Amino acid sequence: MAESFFSDFGLLWYLEELKKEEFWKFKELLKQEPLKLKLKPIPWTELKKASRENVSKLLSKHYPGKLAWDVTLNLFLQISRDDLWRKARNEIRQKINPYRSHMKQKFQVLWEKEPCLLVPEDFYEETTKIEYELLSTVYLDAFKPGESSPTVVLHGPEGIGKTTFLRKVMLEWAKGNLWRDRFSFVFFLTGREMNGVTDMSLVELLSRDWPESSEPIEDIFSQPERILFILDGMEELKFDLDCNADLCEDWEQPQSMQVVLQSLLQKQMLPECSLLLALSKMGMRKNYSLLKHMKCIFLLGFSEHQRKLYFSHYFQEKDASSRAFSFVREKSSLFVLCQSPFLCWLVCTSLKCQLEKGEDLELDSETITGLYVSFFTKVFRSGSETCPLKQRRARLKSLCTLAAEGMWTCTFLFCPEDLRRNGVSESDTSMWLDMKLLHRSGDCLAFIHTCIQEFCAAMFYMFTRPKDPPHSVIGNVTQLITRAVSGHYSRLSWTAVFLFVFSTERMTHRLETSFGFPLSKEIKQEITQSLDTLSQCDPNNVMMSFQALFNCLFETQDPEFVAQVVNFFKDIDIYIGTKEELIICAACLRHCHSLQKFHLCMEHVFPDESGCISNTIEKLTLWRDVCSAFAASEDFEILNLDNCRFDEPSLAVLCRTLSQPVCKLRKFVCNFASNLANSLELFKVILHNPHLKHLNFYGSSLSHMDARQLCEALKHPMCNIEELMLGKCDITGEACEDIASVLVHNKKLNLLSLCENALKDDGVLVLCEALKNPDCALEALLLSHCCFSSAACDHLSQVLLYNRSLTFLDLGSNVLKDEGVTTLCESLKHPSCNLQELWLMNCYFTSVCCVDIATVLIHSEKLKTLKLGNNKIYDAGAKQLCKALKHPKCKLENLGLEACELSPASCEDLASALTTCKSLTCVNLEWITLDYDGAAVLCEALVSLECSLQLLGLNKSSYDEEIKMMLTQVEEMNPNLIISHHLWTDDEGRRRGILV
């Protein structure tokens, strides 16, 4: 059954309350009602003559558990027996659900032991009233026929109270105060819990906390839309979630927790169920792409008034509360931090230690780390006063070793064996519990908050010595730094942040003074050596997270340290999405003097929508600091602004920096830029820079006026642009007159990409007139996806005859058809045509024009690369091309035949061409259909000494094991040959300006 109370009273009792005519009408309606619920109807032959008792049995048989009652209650309303409907509903609600009762008991205990709450329940409810009301309705709004169940994300920074709020929500559901008619079952899963589980099905996972007195757990899945999963602690998972991972639909099939969780999140398993999960900023960025039908609720924390009330609840004594709050209120940075309930508790606990000792109130509020240090040292000193110094040091080292081991193994619940292994005795445990650094969680112990565990894990390294043997689980400083700043969203990020701060001379001295014993002095040197080594690694092998690195550096508040580290790196890639991230980035880059390449994605910063002038001025000042790095280095060459949104003032700051004589920018990329408010000034500045050779505006919308202003700048004598990428810029044929003028007047421009712009035939005609002009020096023109037809080929073919400089032409993804390609071939085979590379992928031609293409291959000694992929060439066309390849006059080096619908029958012709054509070094055959015989013929040619091929485009993984083995053996036997998937994808993207 879906809920146990259905066994306590029968359908029969209610059916016997129906009059004869009502019962007959009930049965007639029962023929159709199940269809509305997408259920199979009961056969009328069984139903027609069934008695009340038999109807109740049929309902229970065909619609087990709650389904039978859903059908019955709906029919009571339709036969106007609202009284029975109300009676049944009330009786159902009064019955006890063993699972709900079990959860009520469990979460009531958790709530009462909530370690950092320490406030009356009504006060807590007031602080989360807005979020609670939003959450109580968000699933009700979505519960409509045909609508997908939502994934609701409770979003907020660490310490804002997400876990506490979710536990409260679970308790309110269990009490019957929340979603009473919406969710029959709510399951609370934590990252910590899933870390301790090996392969297991979803139903097995849920069974671990399923009361024995309840109905079989498998029955609850008959109505998945009545199920909610609450997921907490996603950042604590020891495994990563991957968009491309294999998913599972079967909730009874044992799988890894990674697959089970990911299948739930991506709605592959139980797609009708609802999800509620808590994510921090890091978790949001990491898991955003996985979530379906997402709705966000932001947890706001304490208002100013609520912060004051919290102090009064915490201290209880009015004088202490007033003194503590006045101290915090006078320190604006500290008062802001107290918006977070956990940090507010941290502050109050620290101040309480001082008040109890009669000390002057003092807290470091410059940084988060400073606040944690204040808290930790004060509670440690208060709680360990009676301990001898040596024992105090040993106890702290054991605690920090436990924390570090947990961080490296993703362990957040520690059993007695974990404590013993790390030297934490029972008396130690009592001390840490009294200090509220640890708290009990069932039979295990946990740090009072993950941030405290991260803090202690960083402290572990301050106890190490150079000659200490390596720990079996805990990585050394170099490994920690590498893990934290290479790649994205490392679980060790905050441990690294704390360690950076601890390593500074100022903080090391402060810790030693507070603890009363010496700490390691070598950490800072180890950190800098690690980062220096990382800076010299190949970026293709080590992906740096400069967000993580800059967070670490900013937290140190040590300009010399920041300058030393940031100048190790010549190539920086950063994302700025908030004012806080802008502050951190500016604080680091203002010390950067050796930058060579800079990649920036900046959104949600400009324009400033706060309406506050001082906020706008502050942002512009910070942005100026970021831009200062472009002019501070004589070696700065490449600026890549990717998906950046500007307003006029922020663009002006950028322009002023780039116009400085010391700026020697060589390559400027501004892809998918929004709101280029003052593009004329930008064009003037960047194009009058004598060092600038490459300009790329791919994906940035340019109006007709923008395009005209850009072209005017391009014609200026000081302009030295050689490569211009204007793909996907919303340029139309109307702007082609201005572009054509540039082609005639600018002798330095040798490459132009206009891909993905609707130029159409008229626009191409205008360009062709300029290309035929003797003054045009263009060498490469890319016109893929430009919406022109075979009619344009007449003009393009004339360009091929008259233009002496053009060697590369991309016409891909335009509807040229056979007639268009045939027209081009007439010029291609002419001796005066200088074209060396032609791209005709996806141009809608067939094998009909392959005779003309074959003629070109024989007569053109200059054409070296021909890409014909994604056209219906078939085996007949391939035969014509292979015949030409075998001709002694053929000089072709690269041929693209991917996705040309070639069958195994073409392999004989291809094999013959490969062993005959000595110039051919690269062939793309992706998506060719291969059987064993065809593959064998092809492989025999590939290992032949007569074959000159060096690159072959094939996806080996798409074939069966036998063919895969043959292709692998080919690579082993022919060391000069590489077989590669997506052979040209990256190169084509770069040449079109899509990739940088």
Curated annotation (Swiss-Prot):
Q: Does the keyword Acyltransferase apply?
A: no
The protein's location, in the record's own words, is:
Cytoplasm; Inflammasome
Q: Which residues form the NACHT domain?
A: 150-469
PROSITE patterns the record matches? DAPIN (PS50824), NACHT (PS50837)
Spell out the molecular function terms from Gene Ontology.
Answer: ATP binding
Q: What top-level branch of life does the organism fall under?
A: Eukaryota
Residues involved in ATP binding = 156-163
LRR repeat ranges?
748-769, 777-798, 805-825, 834-855, 862-883, 891-914
Which ranges does the record mark as transmembrane? Answer: none
Do you know which InterPro entries this protein is assigned to? DAPIN, DEATH-like_dom_sf, Leu-rich_rpt, LRR_dom_sf, NACHT_NTPase, NLRP_HD2, NLRP_innate_immun_reg, NOD1/2_WH
**Organs and tissues of expression:** Detected exclusively in testis and ovary, and at high level in the oocyte from antral follicles.
Tell me the GO BP annotations in alphabetical order: inflammatory response; innate immune response; regulation of inflammatory response
User: What does the record note on quaternary structure?
Assistant: Sensor component of NLRP9 inflammasomes. Inflammasomes are supramolecular complexes that assemble in the cytosol in response to pathogens, such as rotavirus, and play critical roles in innate immunity and inflammation. The core of NLRP9 inflammasomes consists of a signal sensor component (NLRP9), an adapter (ASC/PYCARD), which recruits an effector pro-inflammatory caspase (CASP1). Within the complex, NLRP9 and PYCARD interact via their respective DAPIN/pyrin domains.
Protein name from the UniProt record: NACHT, LRR and PYD domains-containing protein 9
Q: Which organism is it from?
A: Bos taurus (Bovine)
